[in-house]
C-alpha cells in the first residue's frame, strides 16, 4: 500500500510504499485492548505496601478474658477488625502485575493501531526530520508549518538537537522506531515517521 510522504510545509509531495501486513490490517478492538492493557500492566512497579496483622506494632496479649465481661471476644489488638490493626489483604511490593502477550499478538496489535491511524489520516511519512539547533521555538515552528499538533515523532535514531528541542513541549514525543509503544500511538493525535524509521518498523513488525 501507499503512504503519503509530506514535506516541511505539510504538503503531500509523493508517496512511499509500505507493508500491507503492517498498515493494511482490520482494526481488532479486542486485540488492541489486550495489547494496551498488557503494556500498561507491565509498566507498573509494585511499590505500594500495607501492613498485615503480623506487621503492625501491637502486643499479642489478649485484651480481656474470653468470657464473663459481656464484651465481644478479642484475641489481640492487631486484629483487622480493630482500629490500628492490620489489613486483611494488604498490598505488597511482591505483587506481580505483568500480563503476557505473545509476540505474534503484540505485532498484530501494533499493526491494527497503525492501520487505523492510516485510515483516519493521522499518520504521515517524512523523508527525514532534523532540527538545526536545540531550540524549542524552532521545533514548535516547524511542526506548526507542517500543520501538526500533539504529535509523536518516530525516527530511526534520535538526533540530539531534536530530542533536546522536544523536551519542553508536552504534546510532542520523540522516540526511536523500536520504542514506539501502543499507548503513545493511540494517545497522540498525529504520528510522523521518518522514511528510515518506517523501514525499521516494517522489518521488526511485519
From Swiss-Prot:
Task: One GO cellular component term, please give it.
Answer: ribonucleoprotein complex
UniProt keyword Ribosomal protein, yes or no: yes
The record's annotation in Gene3D superfamilies points to: 3.40.1370.10
Organism domain of life: Bacteria
Q: Where is the composition biased (Basic residues)?
A: 59-70
**InterPro entries annotated for this entry?**
Ribosomal_uL4, Ribosomal_uL4-like, Ribosomal_uL4_dom_sf
Role, per record: One of the primary rRNA binding proteins, this protein initially binds near the 5'-end of the 23S rRNA. It is important during the early stages of 50S assembly. It makes multiple contacts with different domains of the 23S rRNA in the assembled 50S subunit and ribosome.
Describe, as the record does, how this protein assembles with itself and its partners: Part of the 50S ribosomal subunit.
Q: Which family does it belong to?
A: Belongs to the universal ribosomal protein uL4 family.
Record's protein name: Large ribosomal subunit protein uL4
Q: Which gene encodes it?
A: rplD
Amino acid at each position: 500500500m501507499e503512504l503519503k510522504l509530506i514535506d516541511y510545509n505539510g504538503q503531500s509531495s509523493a508517496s512511499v510504499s509500505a507493508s500491507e501486513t503492517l498498515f493494511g490490517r482490520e482494526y481488532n478492538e479486542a486485540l488492541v485492548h489486550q495489547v494496551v492493557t498488557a503494556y500498561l500492566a507491565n509498566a507498573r512497579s509494585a511499590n505500594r505496601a500495607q501492613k498485615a496483622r503480623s506487621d503492625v506494632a501491637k502486643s499479642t496479649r489478649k485484651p480481656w478474658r474470653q468470657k464473663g465481661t459481656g464484651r465481644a471476644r478479642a484475641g489481640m489488638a492487631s486484629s483487622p477488625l480493630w482500629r490500628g490493626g492490620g489489613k486483611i489483604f494488604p498490598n505488597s511490593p511482591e505483587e506481580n502485575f505483568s500480563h503476557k502477550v505473545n509476540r505474534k499478538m503484540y505485532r498484530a496489535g501494533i499493526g491494527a493501531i497503525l492501520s487505523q491511524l492510516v485510515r483516519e489520516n493521522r499518520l504521515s511519512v517524512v523523508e527525514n526530520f532534523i532540527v538545526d539547533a536545540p531550540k524549542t521555538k524552532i521545533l514548535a515552528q516547524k511542526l506548526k508549518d507542517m500543520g501538526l499538533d500533539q504529535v509523536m515523532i518516530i525516527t530511526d535514531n534520535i538526533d540530539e538537537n531534536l530530542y533536546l528541542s522536544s523536551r519542553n513541549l508536552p504534546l510532542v514525543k520523540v522516540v526511536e522506531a523500536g520504542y514506539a509503544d501502543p499507548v503513545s500511538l493511540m494517545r497522540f493525535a498525529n504520528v510522523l515517521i521518518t522514511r528510515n524509521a518506517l523501514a525499521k518498523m516494517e522489518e521488526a513488525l511485519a
